[in-house]
From Swiss-Prot:
Present with 4990 molecules/cell in log phase SD medium. The gene is NOP4. Keywords: Nucleus, Phosphoprotein, Repeat, Ribosome biogenesis, RNA-binding, rRNA processing. InterPro entries: Nop4_RRM1 (IPR034805), Nop4_RRM2 (IPR034806), Nop4_RRM4 (IPR034809), Nop4p_RRM3 (IPR034808), Nucleotide-bd_a/b_plait_sf (IPR012677), RBD_domain_sf (IPR035979), RRM_dom (IPR000504), RRM_MRD1_RNA_proc_ribogen (IPR051945). Residues 622-631, 674-685 have a biased composition (Basic residues). GO terms for cellular component: nucleolus; nucleus. GO terms for molecular function: identical protein binding; large ribosomal subunit rRNA binding; mRNA binding. This is Nucleolar protein 4. It holds the Pfam family RRM_1. Required for 60S ribosomal subunit synthesis. Probably involved in the processing of 27S rRNA to produce mature 25S rRNA. The keyword Thylakoid does not apply.
Length: 685
C-alpha cells in the first residue's frame, strides 16, 4: 500500500531517529523508473529539488534495473520538498511514483544504532567521548583519528580545496581539505574536510545546514573511516525476510544501504581492497588506444564510408562521425580507432597540419588525407580533461575572432568589424528597409576585402565613419549630434534602458589612450580632458574637395576623445533616425530657409569604426610629437642668437632694394615694351 506525504506524521524529535510508523523520513522510495535510467541520472533529477546524499537504482543479479530505487537526503525538510516536487515533475517523459521509504525491522541491538553519517553514530563507532576526542593525543591524533566531514552535492565549479579551507576555517582549525576525482579526471561530486577537534566539526555542522557553495546547496555530515564501518557492519546480525512482497523491498533497501555506505566513506585513505575493486570496473570515457580525431569531415559521411577510406593506412577498429545530441545532425568531425600502433603512427606521421581545413588541396597533401575533395585535419585523441581545456582555448579563439574577447595579438583591431553590423532577424534590422540592409552588407564585405588586401590598414578605435547623412547637415551639426549621442547613451544606461559598456571595454579604452604616454604625460592629459569635450573633430565630406560650402556627399567622420566615448557614440548613433532639429543645429537663418525642402529627416545612420592606414597614423603621431617637443623648447634654442637674426634682416632688405635710380627707370621701360607687344599680338587675332 502506498504512503503519501499527506498521511505521514513528522516527528518533532531528532530527524535522524526512526519514525514511530517505521518510516525513514530521510529516504524516498521511487518506483516506475524506466529500465535505462542510471544512478547518476536519478541523482541529477532529485538534486534539482534539494541536496541529496545518495541515489541508487536497484538492480538484479544480471545488473538489470528492477524499476525502483532509493534517494536519501541529509535533512527531513529536503525529503518533504523533493517528495512534493517529484510527484509533479516528469522524468524522461514519465511521472515517477514517489513515497517515503520504510525502514527495515532490525534486532534491538541494531535498532539502537542510528545512521552512520550523523554525529552520534560517529561517536559510537569510534568509541570515544566528546572530551576524549577534543583532547585527543597519541594514536587518536593521527590522520585516521581526526574528525572528518563529508560535503555532498558539490558544484562542479568548485575545484580548489583552499576554498573549502576558507569556508570551514570559520568554525575551527582545518587540517586538510580534499576534492576527490575519478580515474578519468572528472570530479566525484563530494569533498572531505578534516578538522583538528570534533567540537569544531559539531560547530560546522550546526552552522552549515543551509550552506551554499557557488550558488549550490550542499549537505554536510560526519565521515567515518571505511575499515571501522566494515567492522561495525560485520558485528550487526541480519533479520530474515518474512514474506515475498517484503523481501523485494528489504533486499532493495539493503542494496541501497550498502551503496550509500560505500559512497559516504570514500576518501583518499581508502584501503587497497577498495582500490582493487575499483580497478576491475571498466573506466568510462576512457581514451581509446591508437585513436585519432578527424576534422573537416563532410556532413553526409557515415561509418560505412569512412572506414574503407581509413583502411588505406591499415586495420580499422571503428570510424564514427560525431553527432550533435541536441539536433541529431553531424558536427563535421569523427573518431577513428586503429587496431595496432604501426597503423596509428602511419596515419599521424604525414597528416596535414592541424587547422588546415581549406578546400584548396596543396601539392604536398597525400591523397589518403583527402576525403571527397576535403583536406582532413587529423590529431591524436585526448583524455576528457585535456580535451576540455583545449575546447576552452578554442572557444576563446573563436570569441577573439568575433570580437567578443580580443587578445593582445589583434593589433589591427579587426574585432571592431562587428561593431555597428546589423544582422538579419535582430530588433535593429526591423527598423531598416531591405535596401538599407543590402547597403550595409555590401559595405561590410567591402571593408573585409580592403583589410584582407592591405595589411597596412587597420580599424581606428576612436574614429567613426558615418554614412547616410542628410545632405543639409554640416560639420557643426554633426559634432553636436556626436556629443548628444554620448550624453544620451549615458542617460539611457542610468535609466536601465540600455546595457552599459563592459569592464573589458573600459580597460581597453584606458590602455589604448595612454599607450604612448609616460606618467607625467598621462597626468597632463587627464587635466586636459577635464577642459576639453568628448568630440575632437567632426567632418562632413563635400562634393568639392577642400570647400566648406556646397553639397554634402552624405557621409562624414567623427573622432572622439577615447575609445570608450567612441563605443558609446557608435551604439547610440547606429540606425538613429535624424530629426529636423539635429540637422538645423549648425545652420544660420538664411541657410535654414534654403534647406527646408531638403532636410532628409528620418534617415537612419550607418555607423562603423573607420579604416585607417597605419603608416599615415604613424607619420601623424610623429608630427604631433615633434610639435609638442617644439612647444616645450626655449625660444633661443629654436631660432638661434637674437643678435644674428637682427643683423640678417637689413642685409635682406639691402639686397632687394635697388641702389641706382637708373636701374629702376630701365625696369619701367622694359615693362612698357612688353605691354606694347602684347597689345599688338591681341590686335592681330
Amino acid at each position: 500500500m502506498e504512503e503519501t506525504i499527506e498521511n505521514v506524521e513528522v516527528p518533532s524529535s531528532n530527524v535522524s531517529k526512526q519514525n514511530d510508523d517505521g518510516l525513514d523520513m530521510k529516504t524516498l522510495f521511487v518506483r516506475s523508473i524506466p529500465q535505462d535510467v542510471t544512478d547518476e541520472q536519478l541523482a541529477d533529477f532529485f538534486s534539482n529539488f534539494a541536496p541529496i546524499k545518495h541515489a541508487v537504482v536497484v538492480k538484479d543479479t544480471n545488473k538489470r534495473s528492477r524499476g525502483f530505487g532509493f534517494v536519501s537526503f541529509a535533512v527531513e525538510d529536503d525529503t518533504k520538498e523533493a517528495l512534493a516536487k517529484a510527484r509533479k515533475t516528469k522524468f524522461n517523459g514519465h511521472i515517477l511514483r514517489v513515497d517515503i521509504a520504510k525502514r527495515r525491522d532490525r534486532s534491538k541491538k541494531t535498532s539502537e544504532v542510528v545512521e552512520k553519517s550523523t554525529p552520534e553514530s560517529s561517536e559510537k563507532i569510534t568509541g570515544q567521548n566528546n572530551e576524549d576526542e577534543d583532547d585527543a593525543d597519541g594514536e587518536d591524533s593521527m590522520l585516521k583519528g581526526k574528525p572528518k566531514l563529508i560535503i555532498r552535492n558539490m558544484p562542479w565549479s568548485c575545484r580548489d580545496p583552499v576554498k573549502l579551507k576558507k569556508i570551514f576555517g570559520r568554525y575551527g582549525t582545518v587540517v586538510e581539505a580534499t576534492i576527490p576525482r575519478k580515474r578519468d579526471g572528472k570530479l566525484c561530486g563530494f569533498a572531505f574536510v578534516t578538522m583538528k577537534k570534533i567540537s569544531n566539526c559539531r560547530i560546522a555542522l550546526e552552522n552549515t545546514k543551509d550552506l551554499k557553495i557557488d550558488g549550490r546547496k550542499v549537505a554536510v555530515d560526519f565521515a567515518v573511516q571505511k575499515n571501522r564501518w566494515e567492522d561495525y557492519k560485520k558485528a550487526q546480525p541480519e533479520m530474515n525476510d518474512k514474506d515475498d512482497n517484503e523481501s523485494g523491498n528489504e533486499d532493495a533497501e539493503e542494496n541501497h544501504d550498502d551503496e550509500e555506505d560505500e559512497n559516504e566513506e570514500e576518501d583518499r585513505q581508502v584501503d587497497q581492497a577498495s582500490k582493487n575493486k575499483e580497478s576491475k570496473r571498466k573506466a568510462q570515457n576512457k581514451r581509446e588506444d591508437f585513436s585519432v580525431f578527424v576534422r573537416n569531415v563532410p556532413y553526409d559521411a557515415t561509418e560505412e564510408s569512412l572506414a574503407p577510406h581509413f583502411s588505406k593506412f591499415g586495420s580499422v577498429k571503428y570510424a564514427l562521425p560525431v553527432i550533435d545530441k541536441s539536433t541529431g545532425l553531424a558536427k563535421g568531425t569523427a573518431f577513428v580507432a586503429f587496431k595496432d600502433q604501426y597503423t596509428y603512427n602511419e596515419c599521424i606521421k604525414n597528416a596535414p597540419a592541424a587547422g588546415s581545413t581549406s578546400l584548396l588541396i596543396g601539392d604536398d597533401v597525400m591523397p589518403e588525407y583527402v576525403y571527397e575533395g576535403r583536406v582532413l585535419s587529423i590529431t591524436p585523441t585526448l583524455v576528457r580533461e585535456d580535451a576540455g581545456r583545449m575546447a576552452e582555448k578554442n572557444a576563446a579563439k573563436r570569441k577573439e575572432a568575433l570580437g567578443k574577447a580580443p587578445g593582445e595579438k589583434d593589433r589591427r583591431n579587426l574585432y571592431l568589424l562587428n561593431e555597428g553590423r546589423v544582422v538579419e532577424g535582430s530588433k535593429m534590422a526591423d527598423l531598416l528597409t531591405n535596401t538599407d540592409m543590402e547597403i550595409r552588407e555590401k559595405s561590410y564585405k567591402l571593408r573585409v576585402e580592403q583589410l584582407k588586401k592591405n595589411p597596412s590598414l587597420h580599424l581606428s578605435m576612436t574614429r567613426l565613419a558615418i554614412r547616410n547623412l542628410p545632405r543639409a547637415m554640416n560639420d557643426k551639426a554633426l559634432k553636436a549630434l556626436a556629443r548628444k549621442a554620448v550624453v544620451e547613451f549615458a542617460t539611457e544606461v542610468k535609466n536601465k534602458e540600455r546595457h552599459p559598456l563592459s569592464k573589458e571595454e573600459i580597460i581597453r579604452s584606458t590602455k589604448e589612450k595612454y599607450k604612448f604616454m609616460g606618467p607625467d604625460e598621462i597626468e597632463a592629459q587627464k587635466k586636459k580632458d577635464k577642459k576639453s569635450g568628448v568630440v575632437k573633430q567632426a567632418k562632413v565630406i563635400m562634393e568639392v574637395k577642400g570647400s566648406t560650402a556646397g553639397r554634402s556627399r552624405g557621409y562624414g567622420f567623427v573622432e572622439f576623445r577615447d575609445h570608450k566615448n567612441a563605443l558609446m557614440g557608435l551604439r547610440w548613433l547606429n540606425c538613429h533616425a535624424v530629426t529636423s532639429d539635429e540637422i538645423l543645429e549648425g545652420l544660420n537663418d538664411d541657410e535654414k530657409k534654403q534647406v527646408d525642402n531638403d532636410l532628409g529627416k528620418g534617415r537612419r545612420l550607418c555607423v562603423e569604426f573607420a579604416i585607417e592606414n597605419s603608416n599615415v597614423v604613424k607619420r601623424r603621431r610623429e608630427q604631433l610629437k615633434q610639435a609638442r617637443t617644439k612647444r616645450t623648447r626655449p625660444d633661443n634654442e629654436d631660432t638661434g642668437d637674437v643678435g644674428e637674426s637682427e643683423n640678417k634682416k637689413p642685409k635682406k632688405e639691402e639686397a632687394t632694394t635697388p641702389t641706382n635710380p637708373d636701374d629702376k627707370k630701365m625696369g619701367d621701360d622694359i615693362k612698357r615694351i612688353i605691354g606694347f607687344k602684347r597689345k599688338r599680338k591681341h590686335a592681330k587675332k
